[in-house]
Amino acid sequence: MAFKPLHDRVLVRRVQSDEKTKGGLIIPDSAKEKPAEGEITSVGEGARKDSGELIAPAVKAGDRVLFGKWSGTEVTVDGEELLIMKESDILGIIA
């Protein structure tokens, strides 16, 4: 199933965190925090100004981004857990 976000929303795939700490300790699944880093998989057409003019999104599919810990809504598309969020929930693009 293809999924295309509407307006200024984006679809994000979380990037999995490391299984070990820098010191070599293995982190169990129950102690892991959900990562606040992901890859944009799909982007809506953008927001509209009051005049109706379209504001193009600043992100594109394939961008790696950081977002707030509680940002977005979890959705399942083709058996994969993704996040859908507003572009304004994105804190920045990782270069």
UniProtKB/Swiss-Prot annotation:
Q: Which GO terms describe its biological process?
A: chaperone cofactor-dependent protein refolding
The record, for PROSITE patterns, names:
CHAPERONINS_CPN10 (PS00681)
Ranges for region Disordered: 20-45
Organism lineage: Bacteria, Pseudomonadati, Pseudomonadota, Alphaproteobacteria, Rhodobacterales
Summarize subunit and interaction data from the UniProt record for this chain.
Answer: Heptamer of 7 subunits arranged in a ring. Interacts with the chaperonin GroEL.
**Compartments reported by the entry:** Cytoplasm
Q: Which organism is it from?
A: Paracoccus denitrificans
Question: Could you tell me the keywords of this UniProt record?
Answer: Chaperone, Cytoplasm
The source's superkingdom equals Bacteria
Q: What is this protein called?
A: Co-chaperonin GroES
User: What is its biological role?
Assistant: Together with the chaperonin GroEL, plays an essential role in assisting protein folding. The GroEL-GroES system forms a nano-cage that allows encapsulation of the non-native substrate proteins and provides a physical environment optimized to promote and accelerate protein folding. GroES binds to the apical surface of the GroEL ring, thereby capping the opening of the GroEL channel.
- Has the keyword Magnesium been applied to this entry? no
Under Pfam families, the record lists: Cpn10
Q: Which family does it belong to?
A: Belongs to the GroES chaperonin family.
Gene Ontology cellular component terms for the protein in this record: cytoplasm
Gene3D superfamilies, alphabetized: GroES chaperonin
- Regions that span the bilayer: none
Q: Is the 4Fe-4S keyword given for this protein?
A: no
Q: Which InterPro entries match?
A: Chaperonin_GroES (IPR020818), Chaperonin_GroES_sf (IPR037124), Chaprnonin_Cpn10_CS (IPR018369), GroES-like_sf (IPR011032)
Q: Which cysteines are joined by disulfide bonds?
A: none
One example GO MF annotation: ATP binding
